[in-house]
């Protein structure tokens, strides 16, 4: 698993499971809104009145409408664990802008 997917996949999965409304900003400035229906290493399916498949390379930012509770592995190099535990960590992700980068992973439905 790559470093990026150790943060990206749990974030998208939490949005999907909790059916959180999100605003997705594309690199060309267009704003899409909906819920994350599914995702894989290359795209995200957004559900609103219709389903839209959006390629991740076109996404600049994903902003959740509410805080999201996220679970991820502790080997994440971007997370500092004060206890240096090798178990799962839980963080709250707030509606702050989060940049999405390409990753490797399987489809999540």
From Swiss-Prot:
Subunit structure: Homohexamer.
GO terms under biological process: regulation of DNA-templated transcription; regulation of RNA stability; regulation of translation, ncRNA-mediated
A single Gene Ontology CC term: cytosol
Keywords per UniProt: RNA-binding, Stress response
Protein name: RNA-binding protein Hfq
Pfam families xref list: Hfq
Family: Belongs to the Hfq family.
Segments forming domain Sm: 9-68
Region (Disordered): 77-109
Function summary: RNA chaperone that binds small regulatory RNA (sRNAs) and mRNAs to facilitate mRNA translational regulation in response to envelope stress, environmental stress and changes in metabolite concentrations. Also binds with high specificity to tRNAs.
Organism of origin: Francisella tularensis subsp. mediasiatica (strain FSC147)
A GO term for molecular function: RNA binding
SUPFAM superfamilies cross-referenced by the UniProt entry: Sm-like ribonucleoproteins
UniProt-listed HAMAP family: Hfq
CDD domains from the UniProt entry: Hfq
């Amino acid at each position: 698993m790559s470093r990026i997917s150790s943060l990206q996949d749990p974030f998208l999965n939490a949005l999907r499971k909790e059916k959180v409304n999100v605003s997705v900003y594309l690199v060309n400035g267009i704003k899409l809104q909906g819920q994350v229906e599914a995702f894989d290493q290359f795209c995200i399916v957004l559900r609103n009145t219709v389903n839209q498949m959006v390629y991740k390379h076109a996404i600049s930012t994903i902003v959740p409408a509410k805080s999201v509770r996220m679970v991820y592995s502790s080997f994440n190099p971007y997370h500092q664990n004060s206890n240096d535990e090798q178990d799962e960590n839980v963080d709250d992700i707030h509606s702050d802008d989060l940049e999405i980068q390409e990753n490797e992973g399987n489809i999540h439905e």
